[in-house]
Amino acid sequence: MKGVCTRKVLYFFMAVILFVAIVASEDTENRNPAMAMPLQRMEQEVEKVSSRCGPVACPGRFCGSDLGACRPPWCCRGCSCSFCCKL
């Protein structure tokens, strides 16, 4: 009988800890919206960059040999390498 009672108390505390962990994680997401929807923010960034890219924004020049350079089939606008566009 004592073992059953101890097990019930243990399960109760485990449930309380789980509940507190779930509530705390939801609260963290609400406080930091940047962490709540990183995928949506990434999609917006890709859309923003792709709207600037294309034949008009890409003069077809490829930046030089430095490590951060755009390489074919990517070109950089004005050869500044601020962002790379796919031809």
Swiss-Prot record:
Protein known as: Xibalbin-2
Organism: Xibalbanus tulumensis (Blind cave remipede)
Keywords carried by this UniProt record: Disulfide bond, Ion channel impairing toxin, Knottin, Neurotoxin, Potassium channel impairing toxin, Secreted, Signal, Toxin, Voltage-gated potassium channel impairing toxin, Voltage-gated sodium channel impairing toxin
Comment text on domains: The presence of a 'disulfide through disulfide knot' structurally defines this protein as a knottin.
Residues in coiled coil: none
Entry PTM: Contains 5 disulfide bonds.
Record keyword Cell membrane present: no
Family statement drawn from the similarity comment of this UniProt entry: Belongs to the xibalbin-2 family.
